[in-house]
Amino acid sequence: MPSPVEQRVSSKIRRTVRNGEAIYEKEYVLNDWDNDAAVIYHRAQQEIELLRQLAVSNRFGGRLGVVSVAAADPEAATIATHEIAGMSLGQFVLEDENVATNLTPWFLAGRWLRQFQSLRLPNDMTETVSKRDPTDIVDYCGLRLDSLLEFGYSWPHSRLKTALLKKIECLRDHCDDTSKVWVHADYAPGNLMWDGRTLTPIDFAMVRSGQPLEDATYLIHRIEMHLVYRPWLRLPVAAIRRAILRGLGLPTADQSAAYQMLMLKHQICRLHTYVRRPASSFKQALHDRWVRTVLRRRLLQAVKNTLK
């Protein structure tokens, strides 16, 4: 008889009310990362244990919030958490009239990461979510670039691809900090809840081990992309970047090899997303083409000196 995970056809997150409280229920499903049910059950158990560890840790509290588990069933790969008050930072960027001047949530996002990274990693924690993904960043980026051709996207040409991977390899070899820490792996504005005082990350389904700058650079990358999607926004990207890195305790990290390397990775992955995801309308197709053009320019800019 198929297991609960094998019977599901897609992931689900649904909002329900229990005893007068709003609850979000999440179901893990095959194809989220692997077609191996054992991997899915393990990752569900891992997320449950992490959320419980966060709940009892003295590193959080006050303005650094944590998700509260309402119910969990690792055998069914399901987790229910209490609703977090406020709005996501994705909504904050688009809707709050103080977004141009209020840097507090961004500083707290960096500070939350600093506390998160101080937690001990379990011995069986891996650096990848899927067994199909390489752990080496050069191989990982090479796989994403090769995949572009599989979707019929004839970029980059072989010389440019080689230059990009050489650049990433050089930056990797010059990274000073090779330590491994907890990585949320989807530390995007939409997964950071803000109620005006407390910053609370949600959705730890992709958590893994990784480099200290991975989450911070991903958050900064997503903010930078907002100005590509919506150039009319009054968004102080440079100030937000500084606030995040100050909160993390690494105010000059944007000058490091690790920062530059991870930003190239994020840009390659963002390009891959905008190539493989079909547009739902003509207007969306034009928008996606613009985003791809910007990302290509930025990647080309990173290696232009080596192509002369």
Name these PLM-found stretches.
Residues 1-4, 284-308:
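Regulatory N- and C-terminal appendages and interdomain linkers associated
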Residues 1-16, 22-26, 32, 81, ...:
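Phosphate/pyrophosphate-binding loops and the adjoining catalytic core of nucleotide-dependent enzymes
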Residues 21-125:
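ATP-binding pocket architecture of kinase catalytic cores
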Residues 11, 133-152, 243-244, 248-277:
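C-terminal subregions of glycosyltransferases and related glycan-biosynthesis enzymes
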Residues 30-31, 81-99, 118-121, 145-150, ...:
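A glycine-centered beta->alpha junction motif in the catalytic cores
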Residues 3-24, 169-214:
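Active-site acidic catalytic loop and adjacent metal/ATP-binding pocket
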Residues 214-251, 265-284:
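Active-site activation/catalytic loop segments of kinase-like enzymes and analogous catalytic loops
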Residues 127-173:
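Active-site catalytic-loop/activation-segment of kinase and kinase-like phosphoryl-transfer enzymes
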